[in-house]
Amino acid sequence: MASLVSGDKEAQISGDPGSKRGGWITFPFMLATLLGLSVTSFGWVMNLIVFLIEEFNIKSIAAAQISNVANGCLSMLPVVAAILADSFFGNIPVIAASSFISLLGIVLLTLIASLDYLRPRPCEAGSVLCTPPSKLHLGILYTALALVTTGAGGTRFTMASAGANQYEKPKEQGSFFNWYFLTLYAGAITGATAIVYIQDNASWKLGFGLCAAANLISFIVFVSGKRYYKHDKPMGSPFTSLIRVVVSATVKRKAVISCNEEDYHHYGLEKEVKTSAAMPSKSFRFLNRAALMTKDDLNQKEGSVNNIWRLCSVQEVEDFKAILRVFPLWLSIIFVSTPMVMQTSLIVLQALVTDRGLGPNFKVPAGSLQVIIIITACIVIIMNNWLVFPMYKKLTHKLLTPLQKVGIGQVLTILSMALSAVVEAKRLKTVENGHPMSVLWLFPPLVIVGIGEAFQFPANIELFYGEFPESLRNTATSLTSVVIGISFYLSTALIDLIQRTTAWLPNDINHGRVDNVYWLLVIGGILNFGYFLVCSWVYKYRNLKDNDQEQDPKDGTM
């Protein structure tokens, strides 16, 4: 979702309008590549916990932690890829290289599943003691996971940006994005259901082999369309100006801050282009020194900046302040995402000890349960855009702000964790009576998670895109991915802490108290929601006010 906005912006500023490359001739190449890569990435990541438990004899909690680390890398690496594409190589080379790296990783996973000596000996039926994986086994496994996560992360956001760059008209870009997300979710659902089902009921070798075939086809298709693509030119690092602000303010830390507009620098690196900000704001006043002109900062004859690391424009200073203002909200989103990703990992472990049979011949794969979140989120996003948000605007003559949407999502996330605690308590009682609980009891919490994500995920992107500096919008929208990545790492640490200090998370959760873990997450969620309300109360939007006035003149000022 983050690429929806970033790709649109990049498409308008990159590429040669007069070039014959690009256009709808690139459409099948882009979507075929996306479909294959989506099937591949979701096909292995959704069932990773089960693979580690069944094929590598790794204990359930440790498997959940490894899965969280892998998912964290999947979420963090897109930002690295976006920076590399924006600053050095462009999107097309990054996608090609990432697709090939992903192919190497999934081929190695297929070999691991095919060759017995690359895995520990399987546990004997009824045996408690199993052969643990050797250092060689783990080394090969981690190499494969590093390759597939790097490859998948390198294409997750750059595919949308590269696709948008092929079109000049915003209408065409919008049409492309509709197809882009339809294809993305189709691939995700296929990987999380069909591929996972094959892995559970046929063989891991066949499941990973199909992923490898999909990856290979997508790589060949993408490279085949290279001559038709419009190649975007790297625009330089968007973070340079931010670093310059810190350096300039530090160098001139003893300078006296002025109240006169003429004492501040109002031009960017190109002296003929004047920036929009007039006077630096009063917040974070120590940074205003970065734009304060001294006698050694300007070349009096040419009017140019002598040293760009000593003088920034007022706009560059204000851009940096905008990031600092968003940071407390960013932390709040991390703290609510951490319990959410931990919840999805624990539900997979719960599913493994439930009755997953639906009818005499079908068994729900534990790794496929998370597809409920994806399907629910898709449905609710459509309902929000076509029904809920228009109805709210009609009744109140106002639009829901991004922070209001995030708040709704946080409340729903807390409710889902509370419901998971109640369901787990019921499951433990059924285990005591000698009857496993039906897996259907796990569906309602996942549905609520999906509804909450439908409010939070687009709103987070809307918030970052609208409040970040224009020069950083391509990277800003991917910050949602960074949030998710950090949350996976924090959830891994939290699981380890709970294991060390309590008996709630043994390797056999039938003898644990996962319900207490959920209640702990509920308490943390409530505390974080209070922190979020405080941050939202004091936060002042940078751009939303004008947008609201334009969209609905009846609103007046906020």
Swiss-Prot record:
Q: Which UniProt keywords apply?
A: Membrane, Nitrate assimilation, Transmembrane, Transmembrane helix, Transport
Q: Which SUPFAM superfamilies match?
A: MFS general substrate transporter
**Tissue specificity comment:** Expressed in flowers, siliques and root epidermis or cortex. Detected in shoots.
Q: Which gene encodes it?
A: NPF2.3
Role according to the record: Transporter involved in a passive nitrate efflux.
Lineage, broadest ranks: Eukaryota, Viridiplantae, Streptophyta, Embryophyta, Tracheophyta
* Alphabetical list of InterPro entries matching this protein: MFS_trans_sf (IPR036259), POT_fam (IPR000109), PTR2_symporter_CS (IPR018456)
Query: According to Swiss-Prot or TrEMBL, what is its membrane topology?
Result: Multi-pass membrane protein
Task: Give the family from UniProt.
Answer: Belongs to the major facilitator superfamily. Proton-dependent oligopeptide transporter (POT/PTR) (TC 2.A.17) family.
Q: Any idea which GO molecular function terms this record carries?
A: nitrate transmembrane transporter activity
Induction or repression? Up-regulated upon nematode infection.
Chief localisation class: membrane
Give the location in the cell.
Answer: Membrane
Q: Which protein, by its recorded name, is this? A: Protein NRT1/ PTR FAMILY 2.3
Instruction: Please give the GO cellular component terms listed in this UniProt entry.
Output: plasma membrane
Q: Where are the transmembrane segments?
A: 33-53, 69-89, 92-112, 128-148, 176-196, 203-223, 329-349, 371-391, 403-423, 439-459, 478-498, 517-537
The source's superkingdom equals Eukaryota
One GO-annotated biological process of the protein: oligopeptide transport
